Amino acid sequence: CLPLLWPPAVAPPPGGFWFTLLDAGQGLAAVVRTQHHVLVYDTGPKLGTTLDAGRAVLAPFLRQQGASRVDTLIVSHADIQHTSGVRSLRELMPVARILTSSPEQTPIDGAEACRAGQGWEWDGVRFQILHPPPAGFSDDNASCVLKVEGAAGRALLPGDIETAAETALTATYGTGLAAEILIAPHHGHRNLSTPAFLNAVQPRYVLFSTGYRNRFGYPRPETVARYQATGATLLNASDEGALTFRLEPGQALEPERYRREYRHYWTAP
């Protein structure tokens, strides 16, 4: 469901941020907006033979939100479900900085390596790269893991990390992983989201980014059961459309669900 008719926004207050997980098919595309800055985390998959999520989903959403540029683009790792919209997004608006886990494997001009320990602050909101370290991980386990923390809450974006990276993150950060909003690692793969990892994160909301009736069976039932056991609320963008959280002081943490808020007859169940 494309967010073309979403009502125009103003901007978060200082210390607040808006987090949106887009409905981008079997892949991932998310946007974090602070008062004066925009971050994009992954650019989604191809959508057929001639279209991709960068052109069809990300750019329209950003323009509707009043964004004229992307301050930082994080490409979590070299996987076409996460990278396919990069070129289109860069054609349609300026992108000031690009971080990715393996620049040598992701042919994106000007991309820099994301590494644990990197961080910055925009408008009172803290951005931290928690993973990967300089060596020891590859492929999905080398995904850039981003934590965003503002005055009203936190979001954890782990890309496609697998068990080895989950274990390392839990050992390194412990409860420092805590976040109200968690994007399920690797779309809800069956071997992920161990009890130790979930105990560290303690999410209130777990978000899945999967294709409708995808061939992988994501999210896997056994993984869903582990999340349900934590008491978290589980939401899937393929069911709900774009999911937006406005993390602002004094506001309840509740998702805006595109298909529920802006229902049309063609999106009715």
Regions of interest found by a model, annotated:
Residues 1-269:
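Non-globular, low-confidence helical/coil segments that flank catalytic cores
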